[in-house]
Amino acid sequence: MAQRFITLILLLCSVLLAPHSAQSSLFGENASFGTKNSQSRFIPVDQAFAFDFHQQGDQLNLSWQIHPGYYLYRQQIKIVPQQAALGAFTLPEGITHHDEFYGEVEIFKQQLTLKIPITQAAEQASVSVTYQGCAEAGFCYPPETRVIPLDVVVAASTASGTAAVNSSATVNPPATTQPEGDATPVPSTLPFSPLWALLIGIGIAFTPCVLPMYPLISAVILGREKPHSQRRILILAVVYVQGMALTYTLLGLVVAAAGLQFQAALQHPYVLIGLSVLFVLLALSMFGLYSLQLPSSLQTRLTQWSNSQRGGSLAGVFAMGALAGLICSPCTTAPLSAILLYIAQSGNMLAGGGTLYLYALGMGIPLVVVTLFGNKLIPRSGPWMQYVKEAFGFVILALPVFLLERVLGDVWGLRLWSLLAVAFFGWAFVLSLKAHAGWVRVCQLLLLAALLIVARPLQDWAFNGNTQQNAVKHINFQPVANLPQLQAVLAQAQGKPVMLDLYADWCVACKEFEKYTFSDDKVQRQLANTLLLQADVTANNAEHATLLKKFNVLGLPTILFFDSQGNEITAARVTGFMDAAQFLQHLQNTPAVTK
């Protein structure tokens, strides 16, 4: 017994006193051990985000079981139907997660369930579901796309604003899914509620091209007959407004119906960018850079038709209102065009007709007041009307930001909103300098405070952007686009070891590698004799999938090392984030990669 105990003590001492090389021999190479441990701690994407679906009649149920220590990005979930139309749905609120590079984002942990109504589905209809997530330990998976076949669902009625789906057409439902490249579902309503449409119409009535015309229009409505009672005056004014509203409503329905036929095309990023440019041009006209209106010959003819109607009669007043809806002044052309373009892009007939009706109703309310009470309740004309017109220019500028947010993502969307808000508050502050009342000083302080607050995203972008640029300016990667190009570069490496960094914009840890690891002087000196390659797989296309599959890459960041013969040194592979000290030690423990 004593002999066994002494033998055990001697064996333990020999292990503790063994040199470093002996330890490596006992446990295997240190880099290899670390790599195996790193590989084993990350699970395949199907296990990290177990996805399931089932259809119950006209409802599609989607569910994700999220493994502990992993999370899904809310903004990276998109639903795109093929030969089907989906009803309105919204993603549940996620958990706020602060990201150094993307700011405040929302994520899902543990479980996510979506219930999506199907308004119609043709034969061989399907829905593609795309999602993307990461591990908390610093590892991100490429976006996953699953195609779900749908059972046939017959639309309840075509009058509800949803067109029938034929067997060859691809219809993206309005206000339910993203265009290609977008990150989050499109809201189920227009960005402006019906109340906003009404308020915009009222505001347009106080522009310099509209308000001075109301007394004249009021006189035309009443005609030259004997004085009317207040009740009769109210009826005539309301009938005129309803005639004008009818024209706008029909215009909204026609444009929305046309947009519905081209819904898929109107969701394309290039189309969204084109619409955004048009909105910017329309907004510039509100700032007085140029004037938009119907040709003068057409306006003259419409005015003659309107004047030929007999004032004071219900039919004549209604006809005058309908024709007035077609006569656009320079102050109303740009807002009306912006609303029509957005309605066409949304493709929602109910929202299109309703929005234009409320817009016309808003423009008509001041006219009813003028007709009933004269000019007593209407403010005097002055420079303030031009300021109202310019303010609506900023309202129109909000529409391109809303559309570009779908193409550029939430991060750039936040920066654009910040830029627009800075411009608006700056404009308002400059206008306030023209006033000298005491209370205006308080408004100026509030405007300055608001200006500083809304400028924060731009400040973060500027300073972080400069920091990142300075951090990575000394690292020099040679880009490779696909597997054949990589193989060609490896064949021409001239006996040098090669490091391949697999990078993507959606990989947060990849950006951390750039900022904190590759920027380190010691790391750069260690890699001085290594050929540095980088493959940007952000698009996650077929070529990228082939490259990742070739090397059995689960996700990013992943860094591969190749010897002088072009063979991967599997023991040196890095999976997941390493800071500069850890990565430097990894390189030093694997001399073959930096010799």
UniProtKB/Swiss-Prot annotation:
MF annotations from Gene Ontology: electron transfer activity; protein-disulfide reductase [NAD(P)H] activity; protein-disulfide reductase activity
Domain Thioredoxin: 452-592
Keyword match Oxidoreductase: yes
Region annotation Disordered: where it falls in the sequence: 166-186
Membrane topology: Multi-pass membrane protein
Major site of localization recorded for this protein: membrane
EC number: 1.8.1.8
Subcellular location: Cell inner membrane
Catalytic activity, as annotated: [protein]-dithiol + NAD(+) = [protein]-disulfide + NADH + H(+); [protein]-dithiol + NADP(+) = [protein]-disulfide + NADPH + H(+)
InterPro entries noted in UniProt: Cyt_c_assmbl_TM_dom, DsbD_gamma, DsbDN, DsbDN_sf, Thiol_diS_interchange_DbsD, Thioredoxin-like_fold, Thioredoxin-like_sf, Thioredoxin_CS
GO biological process: cell redox homeostasis; cytochrome complex assembly
Disulfide bonds: C134-C140, C209-C331, C507-C510
Keywords for the protein's UniProt record, in alphabetical order: Cell inner membrane, Cell membrane, Cytochrome c-type biogenesis, Disulfide bond, Electron transport, Membrane, NAD, Oxidoreductase, Redox-active center, Signal, Transmembrane, Transmembrane helix, Transport
Tree of life domain: Bacteria
Gene Ontology cellular-component terms listed: plasma membrane
Task performed by this protein: Required to facilitate the formation of correct disulfide bonds in some periplasmic proteins and for the assembly of the periplasmic c-type cytochromes. Acts by transferring electrons from cytoplasmic thioredoxin to the periplasm. This transfer involves a cascade of disulfide bond formation and reduction steps.
Full protein name: Thiol:disulfide interchange protein DsbD
The organism of origin for this protein: Yersinia pestis
Lineage, top ranks: Bacteria, Pseudomonadati, Pseudomonadota, Gammaproteobacteria, Enterobacterales
